[in-house]
Design a protein with these regions (language model features):
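Short, basic/aromatic recognition patches
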Residues: 1-26
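Zn2+-dependent cytidine deaminase-like catalytic core
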Residues: 41-140
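Short beta-strand scaffold segments in enzyme catalytic cores
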Residues: 25-41
Length: 140
């Protein structure tokens, strides 16, 4: 599956997380791709979840991140051995300004320390994440 296609799909999911035009901040979405198919999605959530707390950097950082949500959901579809062969994609969208003409653009979605810990724990070697600017992406 093409990187750009997966990232654009995630950008749409992240954009639609909150339709409130007055909301500031960023939205994250992630996907696990295995054998050229998206097998799971994940999004940032404000509710706590024990799965993320296993990997968080701080004891109070227990909210489910898009990356850990996608990994958690993937484990319902594939084994941990198969997950090692999968690719994790992460996308962030954010507003380019605070004015009346603000638009959503891609942002840096490099996984945090806790998410990188989860990625390493499950042996995921290929991670692709969006970077600031339209269409930019990086490899972890």
């Amino acid at each position: 599956m093409e990187r750009e296609k997966v990232l654009h799909t995630l950008a749409k999911i992240a954009r639609d997380l909150d339709r409130d035009i007055n909301r500031t901040g960023a939205r994250h979405a992630a996907a696990v791709v295995y054998k050229n198919q998206i097998i799971s999605y994940g999004v940032n959530q404000r509710k706590s979840h024990p799965f993320h707390s296993r990997f968080s950097e701080h004891d109070d950082a227990i909210f489910l991140h898009a990356e850990t949500d996608a990994i958690k959901n993937a484990l319902r579809q594939i084994s941990e051995d198969e997950l090692e062969k999968a690719t994790l994609y992460v996308c962030r969208v954010k507003y380019d300004s605070n004015g009346p003409n603000k638009k959503l653009t891609w942002g840096n979605s490099k996984p945090c320390i806790g998410c990188r810990r989860a990625i390493a724990n499950f042996g995921i070697k290929d991670v692709i994440y969006s970077n600031d600017g339209v269409g930019n992406h990086c490899l972890l």
